[in-house]
Amino acid sequence: MLNSVKKLLGDSQKRKLKKYEQLVQEINNLEEKLSDLSDEELRHKTITFKDMLRDGKTVDDIKVEAFAVVREAAKRVLGLRHYDVQLIGGLVLLEGNIAEMPTGEGKTLVSSLPTYVRALEGKGVHVITVNDYLAKRDKELIGQVHEFLGLKVGLNIPQIDPSEKKLAYEADITYGIGTEFGFDYLRDNMAASKNEQVQRPYHFAIIDEIDSVLIDEAKTPLIIAGKKSSSSDLHYLCAKVIKSFQDTLHYTYDAESKSASFTEDGITKIEDLFDIDNLYDLEHQTLYHYMIQALRAHVAFQCDVDYIVHDEKILLVDIFTGRVMDGRSLSDGLHQALEAKEGLEITEENQTQASITIQNFFRMYPALSGMTGTAKTEEKEFNRVYNMEVMPIPTNRPIIREDKKDVVYVTADAKYKAVREDVLKHNKQGRPILIGTMSILQSETVARYLDEANITYQLLNAKSAEQEADLIATAGQKGQITIATNMAGRGTDILLGEGVHELGGLHVIGTERHESRRVDNQLKGRAGRQGDPGSSQFFLSLEDEMLKRFAQEEVEKLTKSLKTDETGLILTSKVHDFVNRTQLICEGSHFSMREYNLKLDDVINDQRNVIYKLRNNLLQEDTNMIEIIIPMIDHAVEAISKQYLVEGMLPEEWDFASLTASLNEILSVENMPSLSANNVHSPEDLQSVLKETLSLYKERVNELDSNTDLQQSLRYVALHFLDQNWVNHLDAMTHLKEGIGLRQYQQEDPTRLYQKEALDIFLYTYGNFEKEMCRYVARHLGVPENVQ
């Protein structure tokens, strides 16, 4: 088996595979010796390994014996023995890379190996899954092995309280969903004291379904938001107005990037309807914001595709998994625009208080690895963004699934009729059938076509998510037909029922090419697990969403030269190349978008690191607040001098009265020197005139050093001012990011433009924080009444 895989790999990966095979042989050589040990002797190996690491040995020095110990423990506790290929997968993960392993190859058991080894270092290991159910399942299953070997295992899920979270993070190995680890990071950086923080420094993480977490979820940042009021009436009015707008006449919409903007006619129509002169005037900023969000809600979001309406609420749907994203809402008024569009009650608007992208969160881990059945197609991105390689792992048994050639029809109607015929054919044979769809809407469309032929099926989408485990459990039974969104693409295996193996196994039908080959491959991979028989076939049409979004003009040209049969099946072979090429364009577009967004987010990530580092310093009880404030005084004076001593103006034109007033706000001094064009001709002159005054003032501030109550008060005030300024900063950055794409007409790279303006905004934010702290100290000292 290993030899058959080698020829599929490049030279460097062949060499690595050979190295792994040698290590596997060394692990196997220890099996008999370890099997003779008692449970207590085997458990004592953990203490031995920890001592070796403490004495200077490395993870590489102990990995062979440690892997052999985990394998022996799994045999005793679970009755499961790691296959050689699973040991190879574990070695790949230990090196911080991605193990590509098809469905059913036992990825969960593979993770037990590197998690044990890295947990021996005593710094914590995080095992990331895509949902709570899998986190609990894996913790309960693999946790038994690690606990048998003397390690502590924790579970981090949204439902537990902070004290339980703290215990979960203190464990040697912590299971949970990736978003919750990210939200805990944000919450820790909003904490009012060190005691409220739950995480410890990051060390090593293994991400199950790593492509789903790091690529599919990469477009959605993690956001903790507070509430701010919004105008329900204006939202409803804008939603009503936008329904009368016509595409291309009043607005343009780019389906590829899902961006929308008003045309000149659209702007004029808004100005006429609201009886205003210029929509872009500052006084109409709120109206413009509500209108653009109403437009986005109207054209970029589709009910039963991007969201569902349930119990009079908008519930967002993850287009990659097909699942409802519990507790998630759109920010900046877009969620309220969707509510207005659907005629629902308007909820309070969210204001971002803390945020981070999935990419920048996981890049904080010194060592990161992952497993998935489908990663090779995205290897370039994994390498560029995360410095990880993808290593295809040999299967324990050969894959014998038959992946049939796609069939392409002219119309969607012809396609769905062909799907129905294929279902009838395989159903007559008694084979179970899984029909994969792109959205809730499409799953219900397929269901209607099957209803017309009185075909019995079960439907799995975000509306029936609570029945997911039961539906998947029966999806491999004889004669069973399951229509599912991408929810069925990951997680629980579809096991074949009695007699199904002999009939040919599970038959998978794809009803549309996804915007990534990975997702197509995941769907195919539901059949043919662990050497089972199975088959897959995709039914496509020229009306499919991907072709409409990325190749509408090409479709129109192509249609003229196609040959079809009486069912609408396209017989011209070049259509397959066209579909494949469009999918590659689509993947490239998404990659470029993620890369562009990451470049922008790297800017705010650097700013976030500065703020959070300062914030954590403020939380330390032994931090001397006076030592922090003294430099702020100099910074604030310098900022005020720049504000009023404007370069390019004559000193006689400078506003010395306002300059003096601003200095009095931040300096509690009895006699402020007289400032005028007579003694100040430059910022340097101001520093010279104020030198003695500043020195005396800072001496007064330094005298507060021993006042412990004031130190504590300053700590709380600093945290309050910093958090307040950071929230406002995030708001400003959101608006900057929204507007930067519209300014590409300028002869400047939008990324560089964003970096420049983001720096200006950050310097303003930080300067404002320092001024507020200086004002607070000045008020505490008491500004004398006889200030001149």
Curated annotation (Swiss-Prot):
Q: Which residues does the annotation say bind ATP?
A: Q86, G104, E105, G106, K107, T108, D493
Supply the gene name: secA2
Source organism of this protein record:
Bacillus anthracis
Q: Which family does it belong to?
A: Belongs to the SecA family.
Enumerate the GO terms in the molecular function aspect.
ATP binding; protein-exporting ATPase activity
Q: What does this protein do?
A: Part of the Sec protein translocase complex. Interacts with the SecYEG preprotein conducting channel. Has a central role in coupling the hydrolysis of ATP to the transfer of proteins into and across the cell membrane, serving as an ATP-driven molecular motor driving the stepwise translocation of polypeptide chains across the membrane.
Concerning NCBIfam families, the annotation shows:
PRK09200.1, secA, SecA2_Bac_anthr
- Chief location bin: membrane
Name of this protein = Protein translocase subunit SecA 2
Question: Which GO terms of the cellular component aspect does the record hold?
Answer: cell envelope Sec protein transport complex; cytosol; plasma membrane
Assembly description: Monomer and homodimer. Part of the essential Sec protein translocation apparatus which comprises SecA, SecYEG and auxiliary proteins SecDF. Other proteins may also be involved.
